[in-house]
């Protein structure tokens, strides 16, 4: 195995779901900006980037979230940086958001936009994404997990620990963030949380996964 391959595999062995971070150790701005940048640069279906990253450093807000986040009790207290990843709602070709992407970000020629819109519509219909608001949201939420994985992997390559978290009361946390003016529920929902920092102690057990033969099939 060459050095680059070994570095990647070592990072995946290093990464584990860190339940408690060392509160005295803080991630440098340079390192955390790199982690955020890998989220921003992540791929998404149709290139629509249906996400928003909220870095919660405010202790009072963390405490409010803790009351309804059973899976983040120690992480909210100890993480150097704590991120909420929002998924955008109702991402279809003709929304203001997608129109802004096409014209303002991707700079499509005006004459090509109708064909792009038709491509988006056809894909979302054939893949049953556009069946209802829930299927649209679930599709957007799936995209956020690509960014989440890339952020955790880049963190591991930097020697930084992380923990993805779904263990929270969705309705209560949504209410808190809405009341705080952090979350516009017309535009976004909470997809997942993730804490970053440096482990308080080493994991008690090594990483255990299924064997390759159990989960990988080759068709040649």
Curated annotation (Swiss-Prot):
GO terms for biological process: 2,4,6-trinitrotoluene catabolic process. InterPro entries: NfsB-like, Nitroreductase, Nitroreductase-like, Nitroreductase/BluB. One of its GO terms (molecular function) is oxidoreductase activity, acting on other nitrogenous compounds as donors, with NAD or NADP as acceptor. Keywords: Flavoprotein, FMN, NAD, NADP, Oxidoreductase. Its cofactor is FMN. GO terms for cellular component: cytosol. Its EC number is 1.-.-.-. Gene3D superfamilies: NADH Oxidase. Belongs to the nitroreductase family. This is Putative NAD(P)H nitroreductase SERP2086.
């Amino acid at each position: 195995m060459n050095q680059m391959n070994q570095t990647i595999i070592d990072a995946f062995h290093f990464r584990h779901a860190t339940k408690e971070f060392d509160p005295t150790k803080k991630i440098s701005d340079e390192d955390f900006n790199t982690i955020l940048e890998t989220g921003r640069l992540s791929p998404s279906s149709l290139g629509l980037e249906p996400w928003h990253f909220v870095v919660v450093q405010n202790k009072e807000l963390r405490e409010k979230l803790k009351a309804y986040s059973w899976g983040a009790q120690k992480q909210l207290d100890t993480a150097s940086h704590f991120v909420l990843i929002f998924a955008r709602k109702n991402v279809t070709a003709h929304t203001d958001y997608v129109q802004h992407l096409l014209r303002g970000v991707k700079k499509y020629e005006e004459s090509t936009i109708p064909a792009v819109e038709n491509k988006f519509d056809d894909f979302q219909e054939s893949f049953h994404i556009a069946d209802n608001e829930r299927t649209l949201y679930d599709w957007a939420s799936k995209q956020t997990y690509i960014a989440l994985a890339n952020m955790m992997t880049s963190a591991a390559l930097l020697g930084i620990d992380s923990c993805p978290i779904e263990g929270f009361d969705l309705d209560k946390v949504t209410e808190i963030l809405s009341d705080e003016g952090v979350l516009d529920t017309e535009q976004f929902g909470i997809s997942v949380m993730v804490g970053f920092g440096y482990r308080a102690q080493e994991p008690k057990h090594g990483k255990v996964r299924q064997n390759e033969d159990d989960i990988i099939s080759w068709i040649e």
